[in-house]
Amino acid sequence: MHNWKGVWLCSLFLTFGQLWNGILLAYPLDCKDEQGSYTRCTSISLEKLLDRAIQHAELLYRVSEESCTIFEDNFAPFSLVSQRSRNFNSCYTKGLRLPSSKSEAQQVSDKWLLHSVLVLVQSWIEPFVYLQRTLDTYNSLPGSLVNKTKWVSDKLPSLEQGIVVLIRKMLHEGLITTDFQQSVIEIEPSPEITDSSARDYMILNCFRKDAHKMETFLKLLKCRQIKKLNCY
């Protein structure tokens, strides 16, 4: 049962200012000093901070692709189910008002791109906690898949904290507000996907798509901020 449905996105459907209040004191894990304490990253250049965030997003996307492949290979004839599920417009984050393509992302501000990455990262933290629990119920699941999903679950908060620092560094604002408001959406599994393994695969596949968006948005931000060239 997906007991978490309709719950884990609730916090996302607040103003971005409210989201910011909840993470105001967060710092990126990569900013630990030798003693293990956190710094404010004030000595780290914007370019390096963007590079770190991009590297996180690239790895998340790569690991998500590998996880999808492992899942498909170990659930024959699951490849047929997975191929069908790829075509379903049933991802849990489909209700978020975010750029849906690179061309759309090119039309929005830096603030909105940062907002979009942060919301995407936050939206997947709880589903991966759920996924860790449900994967534990499988009898013959490859250890590599368990390790990869755990790695993603551990890295998402790190990327979240890094985006918070980028927001401070790039926008020079202690509080960010936008007109982003949405009502709570009741998240339901697609009626076409009734098998629990297919639903779990859908989570992995949807995250793969969103991880690619995170990577794309961050690379566009770096192009705008660092290269100052034509980013189209």
Curated annotation (Swiss-Prot):
Q: Where in the cell is it found?
A: Secreted
The molecular function terms of the Gene Ontology recorded here are:
growth hormone activity; growth hormone receptor binding
**Tissue-specificity statement:** Pituitary gland.
Q: Which cysteines are joined by disulfide bonds?
A: 31-41, 91-206, 223-231
**What organism is the protein native to?**
Protopterus annectens (African lungfish)
UniProt lists the family membership as follows: Belongs to the somatotropin/prolactin family.
Give the keywords, sorted: Disulfide bond, Glycoprotein, Hormone, Secreted, Signal
Q: Where is the signal peptide?
A: 1-16
What Gene Ontology cellular-component terms does the record carry?
A: extracellular space
The cross-references to SUPFAM superfamilies, in alphabetical order and at most eight, read: 4-helical cytokines
* Residues of this chain annotated as glycosylated in UniProt: 147
GO annotation, biological process: animal organ development; growth hormone receptor signaling pathway; positive regulation of growth; positive regulation of receptor signaling pathway via JAK-STAT; response to nutrient levels
Q: Which Pfam families match?
A: Hormone_1
PANTHER family noted in UniProt: SOMATOLACTIN ALPHA ISOFORM X1-RELATED, SOMATOTROPIN,PROLACTIN
The protein's name in its UniProt record: Somatolactin
- The main location is secreted
